[in-house]
């Protein structure tokens, strides 16, 4: 619930800060401003998730290779 309040407050801040004088922005201008902010936020979130995914895949790949090597030497022994 707190996240919704923060998001609505942020959107209102963006809309009000883009007002010129006493005139409010038209719907199209407001829509464009909000979409720009949301794209920036979305891109940052996606990049963070992609970075976490890449790091975890690298770690799992390393340990899988080590485990595979150990199982191979345990099963086949030294020949």
From Swiss-Prot:
Gene3D superfamilies per the UniProt record, alphabetical: Apolipoprotein C-II
Region called Lipid binding, residue ranges: 45-52
UniProt keyword list: Chylomicron, Glycoprotein, HDL, LDL, Lipid degradation, Lipid metabolism, Lipid transport, Secreted, Sialic acid, Signal, Transport, VLDL
Compartments where located: Secreted
Principal location: secreted
Disulfide-bonded cysteines: none
Stretches the record annotates as Lipoprotein lipase cofactor: 56-79
Keyword presence, Signal: yes
Annotated GO CC locations: chylomicron; high-density lipoprotein particle; low-density lipoprotein particle; very-low-density lipoprotein particle
MF terms (GO), sorted A to Z: phospholipase activator activity; phospholipase binding
PTM notes: Proapolipoprotein C-II is synthesized as a sialic acid containing glycoprotein which is subsequently desialylated prior to its proteolytic processing.
Record's signal peptide: 1-21
Keyword Lyase applies: no
InterPro entries associated with the record: Apo-CII (IPR008019), ApoC-II_dom_sf (IPR023121)
Biological process according to GO: lipid catabolic process; lipid transport; positive regulation of phospholipid catabolic process
Family label: Belongs to the apolipoprotein C2 family.
Protein's job: Component of chylomicrons, very low-density lipoproteins (VLDL), low-density lipoproteins (LDL), and high-density lipoproteins (HDL) in plasma. Plays an important role in lipoprotein metabolism as an activator of lipoprotein lipase. Both proapolipoprotein C-II and apolipoprotein C-II can activate lipoprotein lipase.
Name of protein: Apolipoprotein C-II
Species: Alligator mississippiensis
